[in-house]
Amino acid sequence: MVECSGTQLWASGRPFIIHGFNTYWLMSFAADQATRPRVTAAIAEAAEAGLNVCRTWAFSDGGYRALQTVPFHYDEDVFQALDFVVSEAKRHNMRLILSLCNNWEDYGGKAQYVRWGKEAGLDLTSEDDFFSDPTIKSYYKAFVEAVVTRINTVTNETYKDDPTILAWELINEPRCPSDPSGDTLQAWIEEMASYVKSIDPVHLLEIGIEGFYGLSTPELLPVNPDEYSGHAGTDFIRNHQAPGIDLASIHVYSDTWLPHSIKENHLQFVDKWMQQHIHDAANLLGMPIVVGEFGVSVKDGKFGNEFREDFMKTVYRIFLSSWKEGVIGGGCLLWQLFPEGAEHMDDGYAVIFAKSPSTLSLLANHLRCLEC
């Protein structure tokens, strides 16, 4: 297992640094025999490039080929697809961060949970009721238990005992703007972190937040990209002080967070955002930092690949410097890497292995820096 020791990660008695990537659709592709080879290709090509951790969805709530068809009921074929993903990662010595829900409607998420609640007759008025309604929380807990205690049909290993899984993630990018005080989301994080740890006390646990500072640290609100983000119901410091949380998680998306397109300003923001969170993870929280997502979209022509690579270099440089100085451990996961044949899933952020030699060279250089 990968373990925490202060601000550092360790595995098999050696320091472990995350040099990772996101490919969120692995389970969905594995559920279809026609697209399953893309799963193997994604993991194999990433491993060949020297990457060691993949963050992916372990949820799909309602809709087409859902893992969770309705509360308390799961599609065994899709569960076996997730088994395949985990087994392929194991075969290629790739660790996984498995996210258990989504703040957004993609693949169901909290909106689908609330729809299920309304269909069951609950008086719900907002998607944010996901975080407070007892029945909705029971749906989520049941799903978490089903995943964490799952026995893999390929490896015959229980997920909670499998070292292939580096960490569980409670929810991707949670926000609760209906309660900008942060109390609602904080209570949910504390409850769910305790619940996950009661089932699986061994694996590491992260929240999945973007890293916005909240009302517990008003002096840090100016670090946020805009005024709204300080009222999204999240709080980087307070959220990560919840018992059971092992890793400080942040995302970095200056291309969508900042309204302008002045490239130098974006890189300055990234520098400040990274430096502040690394400082706080090390000195206020005492835990490693995981940049769970970072990237730049080249879809609308606002930015090109040259800027994307400058952006990546900035993220890697700042983390590497802090790690070399012994300040922090953890690592960074690019959003996102694809094999050929999956281009139709590109949201503008995808780096296609076979079509991105300069980006692969950048990834290789970061690996060399981590190893030297």
Swiss-Prot record:
Domain of life, per lineage: Eukaryota
Disulfide bonds: none
Pfam families referenced in this protein's UniProt entry, alphabetically: Cellulase (PF00150)
PROSITE patterns linked: GLYCOSYL_HYDROL_F5
UniProt EC number: 3.2.1.78
Biological process according to GO: polysaccharide catabolic process
InterPro entries membership: Glyco_hydro_5, Glyco_hydro_5_CS, Glycoside_hydrolase_SF, MAN-like
Enzyme class: hydrolase
Keywords: Glycosidase, Hydrolase
Molecular function terms, GO-annotated: mannan endo-1,4-beta-mannosidase activity
Tissues where the protein occurs: Expressed in stems and leaves and seeds.
Catalytic activity: Random hydrolysis of (1->4)-beta-D-mannosidic linkages in mannans, galactomannans and glucomannans
Residue sites binding substrate per the record: 57, 172, 253, 335
Gene3D superfamilies: Glycosidases (3.20.20.80)
Residues of the active site: 173, 293
Family listed: Belongs to the glycosyl hydrolase 5 (cellulase A) family.
Protein's name according to its UniProt entry: Mannan endo-1,4-beta-mannosidase 8
Organism field: Oryza sativa subsp. japonica (Rice)
